[in-house]
Amino acid sequence: MDEDGLPIVGSGIDLTKVPAIQQRRVVAYLNQFIVHTVRFLNRFSTVCEEKLASISLRIQQIETTLSILEAKLSSIPGLEDVRVEGVGQLPATEVNGPVTVVVPSQPETPIAVAVPLPPPEASPNIPDPRAAEAAGDGRMTVAKDPRYARYLKMVQVGVPVMAIKNKMVQEGLDPNLLDTPDAPVPDAVKKNTLDQDDDSDDGSESSFSD
């Protein structure tokens, strides 16, 4: 004991004479602790499930949006060889710290994408009433003429009609005859053909006479 009458070591209480805690209170305290802990864990798991469900829904929405975007991009021809320059990984200032993104102040340059245009459709062939007359008379039609037949084949393949007509004008042919392949060849054309045949015959005869 010290000067004030307090024990120097320990509480000075004889623990052998202290009555024990009631067993019912111990059980009640233990039950209350277990119930409180279980409620906390249940609430924590419920909140986690809600967060995970929300994140999963957002991920599904993003995947759906990306699928739609990929489908739209794949439907545009000519984008397979497009490359965007200047896009790379930006360095981070710290390994495990916040990432600092440096945005350049240069204006964005538009990317020109060359999209091939579909070939123009050939104008429908309008039947010409002269076709029946030409077939009945046995005259030469545009489709049977070898000079016009190759241009008609170009139209069927899908070559632009304007380019074909320009080529025909350069060669001295009538480009309007492409619209009427069953029409008879004009008399002037047939006359030129006959003149060329006569010239070739005269040339062959002169060669034989020589």
UniProtKB/Swiss-Prot annotation:
Keywords: Coiled coil. It comes from Salmo salar (Atlantic salmon). Residues 195-204 have a biased composition (Acidic residues). Belongs to the CCDC53 family. Gene3D superfamilies: 1.20.5.110. Component of the WASH complex. Residues 49-73 form a coiled coil. One of its GO terms (cellular component) is WASH complex. It comes from the Eukaryota. Residues 173-210 are annotated as: Disordered. This is WASH complex subunit 3. One of its GO terms (biological process) is exocytosis.
